[in-house]
């Protein structure tokens, strides 16, 4: 594998589902047969022209791909340095990148004869995407969501229920994404016969990290084509926010072997990366461990217990990160930084005022880092950030943070 990696950063995972020291398949004996069946089905689908024909048709006519590549002219002028482009994946059907992956997994689930789909969700976007595709195909849908996230993402909870999904509030732990994923895994163990677990990020046991990455890679593939058409070359830097890391991996992966393209992932810095762990910056402030079926960087205490972390963004409020990101971090191919809640809120407001785009709090973190670095870069430097979600779901959270009074969602 070392020789392969010398030539390419795109060959992982290996036959054991590992990216260097990260990844793998740490699951119960009950789940192992289903995991192996899923791996076999996906390996077959990857070379099946009919599978990709169905995917491409749905991406085009149901999701609305390709999503636009947008030159943020006023933001660029305001920052006074690099040219800033936005990959507008918030314009997808359901308002985020999540549906890119959900379509692929549910097509696989149907091929496997599964009739019940379960999912975890934090910001609610993966839950909405899963409920949407289940409604389209007539499948039962159950979404696990932390009770704290149910409160701060009320619009998406209502959307999921409108789409026919059962939303299960999870009260264990701090009631966030980690806890929702724990309960979804418990459900899967007891309902393996008819149930498919549609994971929303590039985490979990192999083959999920690679499979989700491959479905999301449509983002970066489109950017390669679109940026070449717009500028005659690839961007100098690509930037994306990271919770588990699926939108980022989707943008990054097609550029991994283009050494001239800088790659920056932006983690949730919460109240600041400090010993109190009031953040969700696993790479910046964590260390390796095992969670949800894979080895990766995690927020842990001295005894190895998983900590809760904190972020204003429900979609970034996860104490781990996808194993491929952990590997890219360790080998130095990608740089990972953190942005605080305050910085993300500033970027949120600036994007609204200058570009007429209301971003989700997740990509607001990436945009905040763009605002930090763009002024010091030359005017011919091209940055492409992934606008991975729209901000409708976050207006109540932002209003509260900024001190505005709003009526309760009804």
Swiss-Prot record:
SUPFAM superfamilies linked: Tryptophan synthase beta subunit-like PLP-dependent enzymes (SSF53686)
Catalytic activity: (1S,2R)-1-C-(indol-3-yl)glycerol 3-phosphate + L-serine = D-glyceraldehyde 3-phosphate + L-tryptophan + H2O
A molecular function (GO) term: tryptophan synthase activity
Gene3D superfamilies xrefs: 3.40.50.1100
Enzyme Commission number(s) of this protein: 4.2.1.20
PROSITE patterns per UniProt: TRP_SYNTHASE_BETA
InterPro entries: Trp_synth_b_CS, Trp_synth_beta, Trp_synth_beta/beta-like, TrpB-like_PALP, TrpB-like_PALP_sf
Protein keywords: Amino-acid biosynthesis, Aromatic amino acid biosynthesis, Lyase, Pyridoxal phosphate, Tryptophan biosynthesis
GO cellular component annotations of the record: cytoplasm
Disulfide bonds: none
Modified residues (N6-(pyridoxal phosphate)lysine): 98
Entry keyword annotation includes Membrane: no
Pathway per the UniProt entry: Amino-acid biosynthesis; L-tryptophan biosynthesis; L-tryptophan from chorismate: step 5/5
Protein family per UniProt: Belongs to the TrpB family.
PANTHER family the record matches: TRYPTOPHAN SYNTHASE, TRYPTOPHAN SYNTHASE-RELATED
Subunit structure: Tetramer of two alpha and two beta chains.
Functional summary from the UniProt entry: The beta subunit is responsible for the synthesis of L-tryptophan from indole and L-serine.
Name of the protein: Tryptophan synthase beta chain
Organism placement in taxonomy: Bacteria, Pseudomonadati, Pseudomonadota, Alphaproteobacteria, Rhodobacterales
